[in-house]
Amino acid sequence: MLIRSISGVRGLTFSYLTPDIALQYAKALHKLLPAGVIIAGRDSRPSGEDIIQAIIIELTRLGRTVLHCGIVPTPTVQFMVYRTEAVGGLIVTASHNPVEWNGLKFVGKDSTFFSEEDCNRLFELVDAENDLSDANEKGIVWPERNAIQKHVIACAGLKCIDLNLSLIHI
């Protein structure tokens, strides 16, 4: 069974959350978000690579530019949406669930997770099974290898963080 909630979707990998199912959510995300860049990232679950590759292939087939952050913490994808002014993001993760599970979390232009209303609109698009034809022009994938570093540097520079590096001995 695929579980849908305000947290996104979750399911046993390759039983309920397959690359084919994931690309249906990618199609719906493409249709829901305005034109622009989508940030993608994943956790370190072994199944994440197949799922995110299916998503990226589908989004670029539909003409999207995808900034692919690779294996990153979920908040880093949110930060990159904010930092790059992307139109949204997608994270392949099942959070606290066992390794045989995986899931999809969705991020809006404001760099926060989708609201209940946004999730319901996305689920309706998936259920409608709209087959979107290829875009006139293929999208591209930009690998982002420094997303975590950019996120850490931005956090360390916040005025509310008292970072005393003199305490660190290497």
Region roles according to the model:
Residues 2, 168-170:
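Conserved small/polar residues in nucleotide/adenosyl-binding loops
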